From Swiss-Prot:
Heme binds at C430. This is Probable cytochrome P450 6u1. Its main location: endoplasmic reticulum. Its cofactor is heme. The gene is Cyp6u1. The lineage of its organism: Eukaryota, Metazoa, Ecdysozoa, Arthropoda, Hexapoda. Pfam families: p450. PROSITE patterns: CYTOCHROME_P450.
């Protein structure tokens, strides 16, 4: 009886301590006197997100809508972790551009010693990130992007081969654009061709195989413990494959040092400030990590929207074929520069279906919000709700409408720079954004130059997002009717 009594008292004591710690964690914003969304016990303000019943963007959109205009930012909780949600575009501009030196960290988990491929620009912070960023800057130059365009155009010809003479057939658009982007990643990042791409495609589908939202959250909340326990962000067989391929391709490149520049491995290896081989492998993996899913979703969503607006699709195709005709049928830098309306179509897709619904920053030093009494403390995690900004009716009239004219030069200049951030921007923006845009444009040229798309009986309207993903990805594959057409 005494043992049972002591056990019960111990259990109650432990529960009391846990309860007190949870209440203390969820009282952070109240203690600081900061406007905040009242949290629920344990879940904070993201109930249903971890379980996949609700998308993170829905939770952020609700907070943004409820508090915008009341303060420059609002506090909220992701489970027990306090976050700042930036509400005011002036504050967003300061965080991204003018005062980016106060927010040089993303606050993501990385463990280069235990997981070498996490040594990439996306995950690193501090001195390691600054050093790597400086070395990467000379790789992602306009001149190098131009050198890679020829190979990119060659890869896009697969789209035409896959589509062929198809006439009024329903095809899986998600698979089609996924094959193109995977070939780009395999070839441009790793230098793979032919049969090697098949195995590469398999591993690009499997590196998230062991991903669990709650494990990622714990690694974000307790990074030191995660490193001690050797927590892995990605499936080990997949990272072992990517590391092995990158290192073997680097050795192959050095034996063929007269080969024309066609891959990022070569560009990094030939840089004036070279990286170690394992660092180069990390960047190649980061290229896949940051780019493959968002680029697949963007091209699929773009065709989905064009299928629903045939007049916009026809205008885009007309511009593409006119530019190709003026440049001998070749996709050249000059040809891409002439695709002004096509770029507007892509930008409107990125606005309406923003792949990264939020940007993460962590304050590396205290920041006083100008013109207010508010202070963002060192160590505070800041979240910029890009998708909510892109869908704000105060910035974009009738935001649910797909309307490429929003990105005409005059309309674009009338909005603040922070009103459109599909790839992030500023100091910690996507360093490969220029190449990503080039990859999307070249893919869209190949998709539209000889084929027309329309909704079919298998097209899900409206499109739904996958609640299990942090990115805005389609819940199911996008399928459309396709037919070959003559030039308009």
């Amino acid at each position: 009886m005494d043992l049972m009594h002591r056990t019960l008292l111990t259990a109650l004591g432990a529960l009391s301590v846990v309860y007190a710690l949870v209440k203390f964690s969820l009282g952070y914003w109240k203690r600081r006197g900061i406007l905040h969304e009242k949290p629920k016990f344990l879940w904070g303000n993201i109930k249903g997100v971890v379980s996949g019943k609700r998308h993170a963007q829905d939770a952020l959109q609700d907070i943004y809508t409820a508090y915008k205009g009341r303060a420059p930012f609002v506090g909220f909780y992701a489970c027990l972790k306090p976050f700042i949600l930036a509400l005011d575009l002036k504050l967003v501009h300061q965080i991204i551009f003018t005062d980016a030196g106060h927010f040089t960290s993303r606050g993501l988990y990385s463990n280069p010693s235990g997981e070498p491929l996490s040594h990439n620009l996306l995950q690193l912070d501090g001195h390691k990130w600054r050093s790597l960023h400086a070395k990467s800057a000379e790789v992602f130059t306009p001149a190098n992007m131009q050198k890679l365009l020829v190979r990119l155009s060659q890869i896009s010809s697969r789209i035409q081969r896959d589509l062929g003479e198809k006439s009024l057939q329903t095809i899986n658009i998600s698979e089609l654009v996924g094959a193109y982007n995977t070939d780009v990643m395999a070839s441009m990042a790793f230098g793979l061709v032919g049969q090697d791409n098949v195995e590469f495609a398999k591993w690009t589908r499997n590196y998230w195989a062991d991903f669990r939202m709650w494990q990622a959250y714990l690694a974000l909340e307790f990074p030191l413990i995660a490193r001690l326990l050797q927590y892995k962000s990605y499936a080990e067989p997949a990272t072992a494959y990517f590391q092995k391929v990158a290192l073997s391709q680097l050795q192959l490149h050095r034996r063929r040092d007269r080969q024309p520049l066609q891959t990022f491995l070569q560009l990094y290896s030939n840089a004036e400030k070279p990286l170690t081989d394992i660092e180069i492998a990390g960047q190649a993996f980061g290229f896949v990590l940051a780019g493959l899913g968002p680029l697949n979703a963007t091209l699929a969503f773009c065709l989905y929207e064009l299928a629903r607006q045939p007049e916009v699709q026809d205008r885009t195709r007309l511009e593409i074929n006119k530019a190709l005709e003026e440049h001998g049928g070749q996709v050249t830098p000059e040809c891409l520069r002439e695709l002004r309306y096509t770029k507007q179509v892509l930008n409107e897709t990125l606005r309406l279906h923003t792949p990264h619904p939020f940007l993460l920053r962590r304050a590396t030093k205290e920041f006083e919000v100008p013109g207010s009494v508010f202070v963002i403390a060192k160590g505070n995690n800041v979240l910029i709700p890009t998708a909510a900004i892109h869908m704000d009716p105060g910035i974009y009239e009738n935001p649910q409408r797909f309307y490429p004219e929003r990105f005409e030069e005059q309309a674009r200049r009338s909005r603040p720079a922070a009103a459109f951030l599909p790839f992030g921007d500023g100091l910690r923006g996507c360093i490969a954004a220029r190449f990503a845009e080039q990859q999307l444009l070249v893919g869209l040229v190949a998709l539209l130059r000889q084929h027309r798309y329309a909704p079919s009986a298998e097209t899900s309207i409206p499109v739904e997002y996958d609640n299990r993903r942090l990115l805005l990805m389609p819940k199911s594959d996008i399928k459309l009717s396709v037919e070959r057409v003559d030039k308009l």
